[in-house]
């Protein structure tokens, strides 16, 4: 089974921010950009603002979000790179709420891409 890829380079994040599209919900802002290889699994980046809290809180949030992305990796459209930015309202929610909100944002993105 293939694993999801996570972005690691600053240039990758910058490229998605500058050239990609964004969609927002109550819990997330997601930037997405079509990559060169349409068959490739999606790549994810997670950016947690210092407004969320101190490092311990941000890292816990990042770990929970990363696990949710691993579980839902195949729900995302292949051939796209994503940067996910959790909002402050996301901080103390249960894992099931995180999964539910990610599925909701995936649905919004698919609808947005189909309309474009």
Curated annotation (Swiss-Prot):
GO terms for biological process: tRNA 5'-leader removal. InterPro entries: Ribosomal_Su5_D2-typ_SF, Ribsml_uS5_D2-typ_fold_subgr, RNase_P, RNase_P_CS. Keywords: Endonuclease, Hydrolase, Nuclease, RNA-binding, tRNA processing. It is an enzyme of class 3 (hydrolase). GO terms for cellular component: ribonuclease P complex. It catalyses: Endonucleolytic cleavage of RNA, removing 5'-extranucleotides from tRNA precursor. One of its GO terms (molecular function) is ribonuclease P activity. It comes from the Bacteria. Its EC number is 3.1.26.5. SUPFAM superfamilies: Ribosomal protein S5 domain 2-like (SSF54211). Pfam families: Ribonuclease_P. The keyword RNA-binding applies. PANTHER family: RIBONUCLEASE P PROTEIN COMPONENT (PTHR33992:SF1). Consists of a catalytic RNA component (M1 or rnpB) and a protein subunit. Belongs to the RnpA family. RNaseP catalyzes the removal of the 5'-leader sequence from pre-tRNA to produce the mature 5'-terminus. It can also cleave other RNA substrates such as 4.5S RNA. The protein component plays an auxiliary but essential role in vivo by binding to the 5'-leader sequence and broadening the substrate specificity of the ribozyme. This is Ribonuclease P protein component. It comes from Carboxydothermus hydrogenoformans (strain ATCC BAA-161 / DSM 6008 / Z-2901).
